Amino acid sequence: MSFNGTYVYDFIFCGGSFAAAGAAVRLADEGKRVLLLESARAPGSEYTLAYRGGKIPCDAAASRAAELCGELRGLGAVTSDGRIDHTLLSPALSRILMRRGDRISFFPSSVPLSAEKTLDGWRVCFVTNGVRHTAEAGRLVGADLYDALGGGASGHIKKKYLIGLALCESEKVVAGELPGDASLPGGCRVTVDGDGGDVTVTFSFDAAANMCTARRAVRSYVTGGSFAASGLRLAALADEFAVESDEESVFYGDGYARLAPVRFADAVSAYGDGVLFAERLDGETCGRAPRIRASECKSAGEYDLIVAGLGAAGSIAAITAARLGLRVFAIERGSQPGGVGTSGGIYTYYLGYGGGIYCEADGLAAKLGENGFARERGCGLLTKGMALDAMLDSCGADVVYGASVCGVLHDTDDTERIDGVIFRTGAGFFAARAPLTIDSTADSAVGLLAGCTMLGGRESDGEFQLFSNVSCFLNRENGCAASENCDDGTVDQYDPADLGIKTLASEAAGPHLGKRYADARYRRLGTVPYLGVREGLRIKGIDTMTLERAASCPTDKAIFFELANLDSHAKDFPFESRGYRDVVELCSLWDCRISIPVTKGCLIPAGVHGLIAAGRNISTDHDIALACRMMRAMQKCGEAAGVIAYLAHRDGTDPHNVSDAELRDELIGRNVLDPAQHYAMYFYTADPATRYKKDILELTADEIAAMLALDAPGAAVYACSVNRKLGSDALVRMLDDPASRRGDALALAVRGENAAARDVLIGMIRDKSGEMPCSSHTFCLPYAVSAMSAAGKCGMTEALPALLDIVCDPDYAADIPNLDKVEDKTKLICDGDDVKYLYFVGALG
């Protein structure tokens, strides 16, 4: 395969369905190179995200799927009567594909745009999170649910089912059909299958139904009373329709074939059918293929504002602008709004400031949970998505779910101005026009397609923050739905090959596998539809927020504030910036809560007109991106973007010309912004009365001197780096005091004045006691590691012998005590390998 811009294979499958995977495995075992292009985040979504398990069949299809059946049984995914646990289908399939990683490439989050016949076969253009790519192959197979390139699958769909999981509050056997009501469209039936405890609920819709109307109908039905009267509480709802189709696979004579992905009710049969399909590829054909390229985009209409991406920021932006009177068109690739807070599996808020429209959404979600919905942790996943969609519906925003951004429309008279977007759904390609667009796709899909200049990951190696795989479960004992996440390394979500490799590896292993859910207490709900990506490319804005800029930013320029720590989810500190290392590594201030101002200019891309960013794709450097991504702040960011769009539309001007004063006044009136908020660094103290309330920047000289002699000197050390309230001469004199010696040495080093502290720092490096400060509540580092960081900051060559002793001895830190204690300050140090790693990378840095 070639990775210089064009990927080359023997076969390209547009669709990563179970049928496509079965065919790909058969072809790979014959030595062929195969590419699976899939718009979802993981393979087999037509069954896994549709909550569609079925039973192991007893026919030829099952025999062709023996490897898949073996994986499922090995994972405990098959019951004694042959029923398949749909939540383990994706892990099983991922393991099979990984075994053939040298011959099968899986490209997730990749949307085919066109297919062109060439002399040697086919050339397919596709987009992955806003970046266009090209792949070539001798043979092309359409294998996605709606046949995006061929366009003929929709006519074969006979029925759609939206499947959910409900808690049954009675012990009686629950099965059969529930009574309908006026909230459901004509012909929609509600059936229940189960034996008490938790049951499967199926809502049947006709073939024309879309996810937006279907989920709204389910919400109305559940809250209407009939559902709760049956003793049921809805706990989870599928993210894709389970589809009933009579489509047959077809082979054409020009190197194209159509593989029907959902001919069967179970994934095992579909996989086996794919194997059979591969065996028949060189058989009889029936002429030339139908249309195998994207047709002209159909018009989706003209609006005042387009919101691309209905995540934490986008959903609030759309609601805000629509309530202010704008005609809003919103598109979302998933099945519901809310992003990481719904489809991403993150139930609870992490720090941040309160205030804004999102509080209304949280209140509505809590109210939904009182009638017909199961209890959820935090502000909920299912109920929060339902609440946001209800708000979008009531304010008149036009919403399309299952829509992926594919391109942008440029103003014919101004090529730097965009006036619309192109997107793909199961019904084809569409174009919507508006003078203003909010890019709230998180990964800057619109900004990339529009040609915005981008900011990337950390400066040392370009890597982004770690991503997570989040799995959900239902606690049967307390009737509460919850989730857990597992960090799985770094990923480049714009490189489809890297994204595919990391996704499969993450799916194949993690907290959602093994014996964790084997007992009767928990019911596995599966991994969430969105990969837990924390960072991506960000626009280069008119203003860019950095740690230095935040410290000097006038308070009256801020439109909202983030409140969070610099949480990289990693321990490879030497690869981070010097500013980050000073805070986290040298001062052990991992959980220092920084109040970060965000200005209007951070939301406005430089050089591209008609575009506003909202979410974690706003203009910040990597350090600020570690913090400025939490849900409360991102929802505030969305509300600010919605107000900017309204003011720009009202005044007929570009977003960057909107009055800062009027914008701030509006946001203050909406409780998005509190005039009392300012840049600050709030640190941990042992006293609950002052914990995270004292600001490092406001410490006096006497307070700094006193704290340097305590067991929590970190805040005082950092204070010495940002002000001169305590002079260097005083710090040098304090080196003679054993109680403050370590803190004084670090304080001098953080100023770059290490000469007097050289011997103390080298002694700290050689100290193998493992002693650490209490400067943070959750994650502190040994004084030795902090001293290594200080030596690196100052270029202290005298420390090299001590550092080389650590680097050259792989077991140097094997017997260091005190770090294996179960304490709050060490709980992110997982085991002995972590300790060795911290010392090794500290010495390298």
What are these regions (language model features)?
Residues 714-720, 744-747, 784-787, 837-844:
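Conserved hydrophobic register position within alpha-solenoid helical repeats
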Residues 114-134, 409-431:
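Conserved beta-strand-loop-beta-strand element in the redox core of flavoprotein oxidoreductases
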Residues 695-707, 722-736, 753-774, 796-825, ...:
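Amphipathic alpha-helical scaffolding segments comprising HEAT/armadillo-like alpha-solenoid repeats
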Residues 96, 718-722, 747-750, 790-793, ...:
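Core register positions within helices of long alpha-helical scaffolds
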Residues 46, 131-139, 144-299, 340, ...:
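Flavin (FAD/FMN)-binding glycine-rich loop and adjacent Rossmann-like elements that form
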Residues 3, 26, 32-33, 38-114, ...:
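Conserved N-terminal/central alpha/beta ligand/cofactor-binding core
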Residues 20, 314:
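N-terminal Rossmann-fold NAD(P) dinucleotide-binding loop
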Residues 3-17, 298-311:
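Beta1/beta-strand and adjacent pyrophosphate-binding region of the FAD-binding site
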